[in-house]
């Protein structure tokens, strides 16, 4: 499923549930800090971005609780550097609202296309040219609280990683992987996204605490708008994410 669809969900695991419980306690404390809210609240208060906001270590352990379980065993076969501190992504009712810096077209894309993107292809400079600055190994999502599927889950375009891989393998032909970060890939990236929207199915990736999901590093993904009638706790929809970088950068464009 992972190779063909570009993502995989893992069923309830007591070890993951214990980690999520510890992370939720810390997450509530983090979002209550005024300095963190000032730094990370975006989209008119509907999205707490929370990059590296949780105090987890290089193995993902947090608050004395190890990050373990089937999903971690499965990921151990992959090539990646130690984990960064976990991102804490919190979505609140009303998402999305315009983010500071959003153009009208940018906000429409956020609202109508879930701000779909491939992680690591950052917008660089005043002209926001796309470059591969963060060659991730994978995306690991760990829900921290129970929410309905209408509460802004991640969305993935199934099979999109195959299209992205083909496009970028061609784009990087003859270029040493050490130089990929300096290549302007804006045009090929935009063309690849258009192909994905035409050819791939958009699916909601919903999971509960104790469950987990892994998304391929090349998969086009985003965050769905908050729907009317969504069920979520007062603290909003909370998910922790890990995106460790590849140790071998040249593997990035491979499936």
Predicted regions and their residues:
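Non-heme Fe(II)/2-oxoglutarate
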Residues: 166-169, 209, 214-255
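Active-site donor-binding loop signature of nucleotide-sugar glycosyltransferases
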Residues: 12, 159, 242
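Residues that cap or initiate secondary-structure elements
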Residues: 16, 94, 148, 221, ...
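Short amphipathic
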Residues: 7-14
């Amino acid at each position: 499923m992972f190779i063909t669809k570009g993502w995989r969900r893992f069923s309830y695991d007591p070890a993951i549930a214990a980690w999520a419980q510890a992370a939720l306690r810390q997450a509530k404390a983090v979002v209550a800090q005024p300095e963190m809210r000032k730094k990370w609240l975006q989209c008119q208060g509907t999205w707490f971005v929370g990059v590296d906001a949780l105090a987890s270590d290089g193995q993902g352990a947090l608050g004395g609780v190890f990050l373990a379980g089937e999903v971690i065993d499965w990921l151990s076969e992959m090539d990646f550097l130690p984990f960064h501190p976990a991102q804490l992504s919190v979505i609140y009712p009303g998402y999305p609202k315009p983010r500071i810096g959003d153009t009208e077209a940018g906000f429409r894309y956020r609202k109508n296309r879930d701000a779909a993107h491939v992680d690591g292809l950052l917008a660089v400079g005043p002209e926001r040219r796309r470059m591969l600055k963060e060659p991730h190994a994978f995306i690991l999502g760990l829900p921290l609280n129970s929410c309905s599927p209408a509460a802004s889950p991640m969305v993935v375009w199934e099979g999109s990683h195959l299209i992205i891989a083909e496009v970028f393998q061609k784009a990087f032909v003859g270029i040493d992987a050490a130089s990929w970060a300096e290549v302007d890939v804006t045009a090929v990236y935009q063309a690849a996204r258009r192909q994905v929207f035409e050819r791939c199915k958009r699916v909601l990736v919903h999971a509960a605490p104790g469950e987990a999901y892994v998304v391929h590093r090349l998969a086009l993904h985003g965050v769905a708008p908050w729907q009317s009638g969504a069920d979520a706790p007062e603290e909003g929809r909370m998910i922790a994410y890990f995106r460790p970088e590849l140790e071998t950068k040249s593997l990035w464009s491979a499936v």
